[in-house]
Amino acid sequence: MQKDYQKLIAYLCDFLEKEVQKKGFKKVVYGLSGGLDSAVVGVLCQKVFKENAHALLMPSSASMPESKTDALNLCEMFSIPYTEYSIAPYDKIFGFHFKDASLTRKGNFCARLRMAFLYDYSLKSDSLVIGTSNKSERMLGYGTLFGDLACAINPIGELFKTEVYELARHLNIPKKILNKPPSADLFVGQSDEKDLGYPYSVIDPLLKDIEALFKNKPIDAEALTQLGYDEILVKNITSRIQKNAFKLELPTIAKRFNPE
């Protein structure tokens, strides 16, 4: 079904305003990477909270220079207040102590470090942390637990990546950001497509069918292949969903022990 994106923008702005107010806050903070998702969230926050929406730019030693440039251009274009904190000195210390660390470990460290900066800023400024993960990432578990997945409110968490692209066009996000390959910018050469094996234009239709057909039920891979999806695609995506499902759950706490 074709979305009315102007109505969606109004809905998300209303959602942000009401949820932040409900939690007793007037200000928000979020990480701005120069990528699509954070740009969309940034512009939505700016529409609602104006000068009370603050962006943190947190480049690492592996961040591409154009990521920072794109983030700064967005801030200038939409009058977004921002602060820059380089996390490069900290990720270099991690690299010094863990020389054999995989790229995934390094990336997770940077993601959690950024969230530490965001929550420290939120305490200092009495602001609420806003999330920037889309539904495609959340379903796939393509994010860092207690890193980029951590937040108090997420306005785009129910939008698939392809929907975020369309929303971005209606928000007048710069074409430079729209046209760049999706990337978490966690290490040199990293991209979502390389990590996931497929572009979102291929993944999202499958994710939508999985949600529609198997919400709260075991995924039937054979039924998906009968719909025409490639068998290897189905296997890879469903495996990732099942493996990372725990990332969307609250911690499991043992029930109170009552001895007989």
Swiss-Prot record:
Record: residues binding Mg(2+): D37, E137
Gene3D superfamilies, sorted: HUPs
Catalytic activity: deamido-NAD(+) + NH4(+) + ATP = AMP + diphosphate + NAD(+) + H(+)
Protein name: NH(3)-dependent NAD(+) synthetase
Sections of the chain in a coiled coil: none
Residues that coordinate or bind deamido-NAD(+): R112
The protein's assembly and partners: Homodimer.
Presence of the UniProt keyword Ligase in the record: yes
HAMAP family the UniProt entry points to: NadE_ammonia_dep
Keywords attached to this entry: ATP-binding, Ligase, Magnesium, Metal-binding, NAD, Nucleotide-binding
Family to which this protein belongs: Belongs to the NAD synthetase family.
Gene name of the encoded protein: nadE
CDD domains: NAD_synthase
Organism expressing this protein natively: Helicobacter pylori (strain P12)
One MF annotation (Gene Ontology) recorded for this entry: NAD+ synthase (glutamine-hydrolyzing) activity
Function: Catalyzes the ATP-dependent amidation of deamido-NAD to form NAD. Uses ammonia as a nitrogen source.
Cellular component GO terms held in the UniProt record: cytoplasm
Manganese is among the record's keywords: no
Residues binding ATP: G31, L32, S33, G34, G35, L36, D37, S38, T132, K161, S183
Pathway: Cofactor biosynthesis; NAD(+) biosynthesis; NAD(+) from deamido-NAD(+) (ammonia route): step 1/1
